[in-house]
Amino acid sequence: MTDIIEKNAEENNCEVYGVTQKDFQIIKNYGYCIDFSLNNMYYKNDCFTITTGAVYQVQNCSLALTAAEVLKKTGVVKLESNAVHKAVKKVQWHGRMEQIADNIYVDGAHNPEGIEALIC
């Protein structure tokens, strides 16, 4: 998938922004939320908290944060750092490792990578 995106970006003279596992580090997984740090060209070991115990959502959140900074840099949106941190902490992913009762979780894993992350 990455190859296809990079090829299309090159053909259209567009930048590609991504996040790899080396860009973030899980500080603590409490089971119901995760503290992590993000270190890339936009964030310098900034700490965030997401309200899910789904480890794979750390990379998704990191990518969303990076995309927001790209949009900020290009003048598409205005963002304040403290507002971004607060917003991330309030995000809820209904149907993504959502606990609906004691020991009962719902997850709508919708692709092979999501299913792999769910069962591993």
Residue spans for each PLM region:
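Nucleotide phosphate-binding/pyrophosphate-handling subdomain across enzymes
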Residues: N39-C120
